[in-house]
Amino acid sequence: MKVAVFTPMPPERSGIADYSALLLPALRARSEVAVVKRGAKKPPRGTDLCVFHVGNNPEAHGWIVEALRRTPGLVVLHDFVLHHLVAGLTIGRRDGHGYLDAMEREGGVVGRLLGHAVLDKRIPPLWENRPEDFHLAGEVLGLATGLIVHSHHVHDRARAARYGGPIWIVPHPAFPVPAVPSVEVAGEPLFGTFGNVNASKRVPQLLEAFARVRRGHPGSGLLLVGAASPGFDLDRRLQRLGLDDAGLVREGFVDEQRLWALMRACDVHLNLRSPTMGETSGTAIRALALGKPLVVSDVGWFSELPGDVALKVPVDDDEVATLVAALTLLATRPDVRAAMGAAALDLARREHDLDRVADLYVSAFEQSAGGAAVSDDVLRDVSRAAAEVGIEPGSVEASDIATRLGEVGLGG
């Protein structure tokens, strides 16, 4: 079986590029897999199955959606909410009507009116402040002959959006831990959070909670790694909380080796976010592989993590107080940190093992390609039978047969 994979790849700065680079060698050991050149719209000749990795970044995935439009296939849906992707493919290309159509397909007349308000700059962009209310995944779901997802959360949202095709839940593979020594970072214990620094990563709530924790545990430290999003005034927030020179260490974007070294230095990893786009966190998977305890927002995939590896913080009016309680527990109980870390490492080895994930992928490939083969066989049999009774292509009878086949998901 020949599989063509449409995906971003390194050196693109994309979590999905890193994901594919990790997974592809294991897939190639099990199947004939070719990565399609970036920007290509068609698979190589002789391809049995096309696999499209789709995420919410228009720069990384716009060309992949264009290829999917030409050749529907198996979609690996890394994010369920695709509003930013659709906005980039429409508004970003001066196709306002395309954006309005997408909003109307999902939200009816109200959706279209909101789309007009966005285009007229009467309200802020919905992909920035209300993306979860309008996921705009409809087109991709309509083109997908099957879905691979990483969580029950995305599975359930796809079904709620009336996707009727096959769905395979395949865990995110664990990254192999490189032999990178830890670096010295002040803080005992040291809490760490990795990724873009912005409001959706609950950084304001985290900073307020840490400021409270540090009053009772002045030796504790917080490591923030990642670029601050435009418009997010981190320095002002730090000064207001008295954290500018007290217990907080900042690093911007770091390369992979530095990332691992900093992650290894942390005693506890925080992975907070709301709203969720339906993503699975690559940094959380790395933390599991390192055997580190997690504190996460109780949303999406993060809610599915076992309670013995992650303390879950509901996104509600008590979020800061709950964060304070979680951080205080982990600051004062090294035995709890050790037990959670051991459970995290066991989970990574058991559920997120790379070979296990690759086997699940290949099984999905075979089932997906097999389904297409069955469809082709049925169509050939119908065509042969029609010819035998004198039904000509293009006739009324042939059109009626094509309509009936389309109703059961066969034919073009």
What are these regions (language model features)?
Residues 141, 253-254, 261-266:
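Short alpha-helical donor nucleotide-sugar binding micro-motif in glycosyltransferases
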Residues 345-346, 350, 354-412:
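C-terminal amphipathic helix plus adjacent low-complexity
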Residues 125-166, 174-176:
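A short, active-site helix/loop in glycosyltransferases that binds the activated sugar's phosphate group
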Residues 221-235:
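Glycosyltransferase donor-sugar binding loop
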Residues 145, 263-278, 292-293:
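Acidic donor-binding loop of glycosyltransferase active sites
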Residues 234-257:
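Nucleotide-activated donor-binding/catalytic signature segment of Leloir-type glycosyltransferases, i.e.
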Residues 148, 184-201, 207-210:
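Conserved donor-binding/catalytic core segment of Leloir-type glycosyltransferases
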